[in-house]
Amino acid sequence: AVYHGPTGLRTIAARVHRLTGILAEGLRQGGVKVLTARYFDTLHVETDTDVPGFNLRRVSATVRGISLNEKTTRADVACLIEALTGKATDIATFNTLDAQAAKSSPLADLLRSDAILTHPVFNTHHTEHAMLRYLKKLQNKDLALDHSMISLGSCTMKLNATSEMIPITWPEFSD
């Protein structure tokens, strides 16, 4: 949330929901019964098919759960539609499904309208460099063992002379 910020999270959520809508519409048009009426990223579908390469949750013998996330691609959705319906999904079909899914979003009345993640920390660190600086700043605030107790725990090692350490390099001790 710190890296993506409120705008990034909304973008990710909208994309995942859109892909889920495309999947639902493609499955419906392919004859697969979608049991989930209101969904965000997860669908329950009536099928006993397991798709190789995908981890479908077995809800029952005839129902599978399909969850999408920000790593899901258009190709993944097309592959799922093809595997579960037996119909190939080309780019034109996919774009048609996208347009149809956008018109029938089941969550339109549940969309949040108020501001989210309003604290400045969620609105300032949106590059890798800024994020690393922020994490380093947090690390510097932390009182850790490497800043406080290390001197007590390692004083015996510090006092060992180099000549005293030579025997640990002998093959008799190292193998």
Residue ranges and their predicted role:
Residues 1-60:
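Conserved small-domain helix->loop->beta segment predominantly found in fold-type I
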